């Protein structure tokens, strides 16, 4: 497997719709308008999250069960800023819609700006031929409230191209998160 460069990412986005909307350079803001960077980087693509968040709450004192998840455990927040309570988490979705090629596996890593504040971004790999908006999980590991900014960089996607195509892709096996849009809760 080899990691793919900015040239490859740009070509795949522009010619094959791999990332939509696509920002072909890294946006950093200006002196009077600082933003957490997003867009193409040397060997990855920095994604943004939308302004729709689902913040976890324990008001129902429910048990967290991935096979029987209670959607009432979340509070919907529509804002350019999301405050995550101490030792809690929130879900969001990428602005970008992805179409992963059959011979590519995509890994998501959190941005160091957030990690240095105790905010961890978790996403499972984007498998070959998966497509959709990515549901992002932000964990606040601190004992203070933490802030996430919508429409700014939150994580980086790395694209790994295999030496050979997989026998069965995510699309072939009709994966349960295929084509997801918006924040998607656990499915079994």
Curated annotation (Swiss-Prot):
Catalytic reactions of this protein: dCTP + H2O + H(+) = dUTP + NH4(+)
Q: Which residues form the active site?
A: 137 (proton donor/acceptor)
**Annotated dCTP binding sites:** 111-116, 135-137, 156, 170, 180
Listed pathway(s)? Pyrimidine metabolism; dUMP biosynthesis; dUMP from dCTP (dUTP route): step 1/2
Which Pfam families does this entry report, sorted A to Z? Answer: DCD
UniProt keyword annotations, A-Z:
Hydrolase, Nucleotide metabolism, Nucleotide-binding
Return one GO MF term.
Answer: nucleotide binding
Query: Where in the sequence is the signal peptide annotated?
Result: none
Looking at the keywords, is Hydrolase present?
Answer: yes
Gene3D superfamilies noted in UniProt: 2.70.40.10
- What EC number(s) does this enzyme carry? 3.5.4.13
Q: What class of enzyme is it?
A: hydrolase
A GO BP term here is: dUTP biosynthetic process
For this protein, the record's SUPFAM superfamilies field holds: dUTPase-like
Question: Quaternary form?
Answer: Homotrimer.
Task: Name the family the entry cites.
Answer: Belongs to the dCTP deaminase family.
Query: Which PANTHER family does this chain map to?
Result: DCTP DEAMINASE
Query: Its biological function?
Result: Catalyzes the deamination of dCTP to dUTP.
Name under which the protein is recorded: dCTP deaminase
The scientific name of the source species is: Pseudomonas fluorescens (strain Pf0-1)
Print the organism lineage.
Bacteria, Pseudomonadati, Pseudomonadota, Gammaproteobacteria, Pseudomonadales
Supply the gene name: dcd
């Amino acid at each position: 497997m080899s990691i793919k460069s900015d040239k490859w990412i740009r070509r795949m986005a522009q010619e094959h719709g791999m990332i939509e909307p696509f920002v072909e350079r890294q946006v950093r803001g200006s002196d009077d308008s600082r933003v957490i960077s997003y867009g193409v980087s040397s060997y990855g693509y920095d994604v943004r999250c939308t302004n729709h968040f689902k913040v976890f709450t324990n008001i129902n004192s429910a048990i967290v069960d991935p096979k029987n998840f209670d959607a009432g455990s979340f509070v919907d927040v529509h804002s350019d800023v999301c405050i995550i309570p101490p030792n809690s988490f929130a879900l969001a979705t990428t602005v970008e819609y992805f179409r992963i090629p059959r011979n590519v596996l995509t890994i998501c890593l959190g941005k160091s700006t957030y990690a240095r504040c105790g905010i961890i971004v978790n996403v499972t790999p984007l498998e070959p031929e998966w497509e959709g908006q990515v549901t992002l999980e932000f964990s606040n590991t601190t004992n203070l409230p933490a802030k996430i900014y919508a429409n700014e960089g939150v994580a980086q996607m790395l694209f790994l191209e295999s030496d050979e195509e997989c026998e069965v892709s995510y699309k072939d096996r009709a994966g349960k998160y295929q084509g997801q849009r918006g924040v998607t809760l656990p499915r079994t």
